[in-house]
Amino acid sequence: MALTYPHLLSPVKVGGVVLRNRLICTASNPHFIQATEKWPTEALITHYANKAKAGAAVVTCKGNNPVKTTDPHSLTLDIHTGQHQHMFAQVAEAVHYYGAKASYLVLPDMNIVKGYDASDGVLSEFVAGDGSKAELGKAAPRELLYRMVEEYGKEAKLAQSLGFDMCFM
């Protein structure tokens, strides 16, 4: 019997980084794994660690800026608050313990981009700022896009300082 993906579990070198296989866990936050905490709880840290333990080469942690939302189940973590940062560092450490690379999902600050979208008149779930409903937005001006690039860079640097190996955008 021939394997469809014979190299799936083989190591791969991407740039200067060697991944133990080609399994990548994208961002996931189970909605009910924690309450309203704005930092990764032990349960969420264990969730990410288990993905690494199960064999993923890269585990992506979601940790965007908190926003006011109409979704009561929205899980928005806050990596920018100093007293929360050690918990994000524990996520990276737990993922590293099982031999995986820790990735951090960088998302736009919805407080900045609310009301804007990629183009005028396109129905989008991102216009409302929380994904709760689709609305028509207006095209983001160039200045806002440059500001977002700066914010992405700052957040990526912060994640790196807390032990994350890469960012997912």
For each feature predicted by the language model, list its residue ranges:
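Flavin-dependent oxidoreductase catalytic cores
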Residues: 1-169
